[in-house]
Amino acid sequence: METRLHQLPPCILEQFHFLNDLKYPVLIRQHLGNWIKDSLHNAPTYTNNMQSMYELDAAKFFTALVNEVDQVSANLPNKRKCLLCRSAIMLRDQNFQNLTQLYLTLLHQIQPNCEKGCKTEYTIAQTSSDGQQTDVLYGLQQLHVMERNNWKETQQLIQECEQDHVQRLSNQRSHNKRIQCYSLKQRSLVDAFQKTIRKAEEVLNLVYNKYIFEWQKTQMFPEVRSTNAYSLDEIQTWYESLAAIMWNTKDQIHLTMKSQLREHVSQEINSDLWKVMKDVKDFIKLLLHKAFIVENQPPQVMKMNTRFCATVRLLIDNALIMKIGNPKVTVSIISETQAQQIQSTNAAADFSAGEIENNIGNLQYQLSNKFLANFSNMRLKKINRGNRKLNKLVVDEKFALLFQSSFTLEQEELTVTVWTLSLPAVVIVHVNQEQLAWTTIIWDNLCAKADRKLFEVPNLIPWNRLVEAISMTFSARVGRGLTDENMQYMYRKAYRDKLSFSVSNDQMISFAQFCKDTTPECNYTFWEWLYAALKIIRDHLQVLWVDNTIIGFIHKSTAEKYLAKCVPGTFLLRFTDSVLGGISIAWVHESNDGQRQVLHIQPFTAKDLVVRSLANRICDLGELTYLYPTIPKQEAFGRYTAPAIQKPRSKHYISAEMRTVLIFAPSSNQSSSSTPNAEQSPSTSSNDMFSNEYVLTNLDEIYKFEIENDDMLSIQDYWEQQ
């Protein structure tokens, strides 16, 4: 054991010797040994990317240690009480620069099996003390110092006043001088309390406006995991630290006001103490309000009379949960105007723009250290729409869910009302409204800012932001985002621009360009075309899209350029301009006379793919051999094909299936009958982005049929017998 002790780093060895000092720390071991063991027995350990959590745990542990000393010492004789208090304060203050290291030393002793992991974290904790901490952790560290200094000054001032109370009758003149000195210290202490509150407000605003908002952005775009976005569990530890610091500050102010110090407090200072106490309570209310968040958002496109769910969470620790109980939470739906009124007054109200079924729940503590209210079966039964402008559609109107709760902290004259809003939602009554509803949501999510007026959006946003959001939407809904080439094609499509892809950071696009204005050549908008492609991928092509077998968003001329030097039978898949939600096959065709052309098969739509999948159709066509550039067709699509054999209705029948074939229109040149005619060949206008497709029709009119199965061997035999 002695050998292992000497192997410890010098700073830790020094702290260990301090722990075993025979003067004061022995009292800590005697009176708080079991408490320390219980506190650290199940203390969490962290992986390498969460080393900063040890700093928070260490600060909370030693703050709790001093508080535990106060409770234990209440039943001790005065002399022993003072010794115990001083030993606890000395233990913490003398190791302030290495609190995390001391905490890990204790953790090694209580949890030997985590020693290896903790040693790793100890090394990292040392490096993080060189300034590589988050701004929140630095602010919390400052607050811990301020709170501890306030505690020391409060205790010192009270002790001096108690001593003076005994001596003042014997020496009145000296007592008057002391009063002046106390008044200065009292003023300094009040100022220190005020600085602590202001610093706490600064840290809280940083946590809420920056880190909570960054976390909410991941709700808007779930597939994005920002390196700056902390998990809610980590953010909760920040809230817990703020709550502990301010609760201790409230106790310090209360102790100052209730002790014998009142005999020395001037009227002005006494009034300031009451004001500071009010400020602390107001901060605790604000902290709880900003700790109330929507963890699982309701759908942002909400269909009437359709079930949906949501979850709210209060980011506080067990100590406050015990004071709160299980308060009720109510949910209502409010309009954009009502949301703005709540935002401007910073107070919830009995607003409602509709009726929600199963809208009442309770906050309950979970074993995962979460304080949640789950709403798993809500249903929007009624919606009250506002007076819409003449040119404003139903899908342009935004709503939000308002979650509210109210509770009183036990043994405290402190009633707290908390509320929070969901992300904006569009309410629809029919599924065909979903397409335009998503334009409103995507645009709003892109324009979301922590300090904006709910739910106002600008008319223009940068194209780069929009196309990034579109890519994230594809990633979330169909499993893969867009390539740079896809984005280039979309840029030309959105701006109707034939120039090369070169977008500056200040290139803007309007909401009308995005989803209102139709193209002159085609009677649909950019978003309608894009959404139709997204929908057919989601419903019929997702596995192919994720597997990168579909290029999809590529211009016709670019596809022809890619295929121009490929061997006959090479093909690629692209979404067409002329048919919404249509996917076409471009392939290299070689005629009987050896001439090669890039031809395009008539687009398949969702109706076609319901009958027979795209993978099966591709395998039907012997003309197609290689997926661009050189992937054998069976290798790319074989695992996605499935036999479409239908069981006969009775044993007297056999089944047949439909297959896709190409129908080449007859050519005026009989010597080249297999070559498409001029109307089907690439025209001189093929470089025009919005030119009509030149196509070869695919034969789907070979329906499933049944044949009597007596002595018949083939379809031909059957017809010959008729």
UniProtKB/Swiss-Prot annotation:
Taxonomic superkingdom: Eukaryota
One example GO MF annotation: RNA polymerase II cis-regulatory region sequence-specific DNA binding
Example of a GO cellular component annotation carried by this entry: cytoplasm
GO BP terms, alphabetized: cell surface receptor signaling pathway via JAK-STAT; defense response; regulation of cell population proliferation; regulation of transcription by RNA polymerase II
Start and end residues of each SH2 domain: 545-644
Residue ranges of the TM segments: none
Induction behaviour: Bacterial challenge results in nuclear translocation in fat body cells and induction of DNA-binding activity that recognizes a STAT target site. In vitro treatment with pervanadate (vanadate and H(2)O(2)) translocates protein to the nucleus in midgut epithelial cells.
InterPro entries: p53-like_TF_DNA-bd_sf, SH2, SH2_dom_sf, STAT, STAT_linker, STAT_N_sf, STAT_TF_alpha, STAT_TF_coiled-coil
Keywords: Activator, Cytoplasm, Developmental protein, DNA-binding, Nucleus, Phosphoprotein, SH2 domain, Transcription, Transcription regulation
Compartments (UniProt record): Cytoplasm; Nucleus
Tissue specificity note: Expressed in hemocytes, pericardial cells, midgut, skeletal muscle and fat body cells.
Region (Disordered): 667-689
Compositionally biased residues, Polar residues: 675-689
Pfam families linked: SH2 (PF00017), STAT_alpha (PF01017), STAT_bind (PF02864), STAT_linker (PF21354)
Family: Belongs to the transcription factor STAT family.
SUBUNIT field: Forms a homodimer or a heterodimer with a related family member.
Function: Signal transduction and activation of transcription. Plays an important role in the segmental pattern formation in the early embryo by activating specific stripes of pair rule gene expression. The STAT pathway directly participates in immune responses in insects.
Protein name as catalogued: Signal transducer and transcription activator
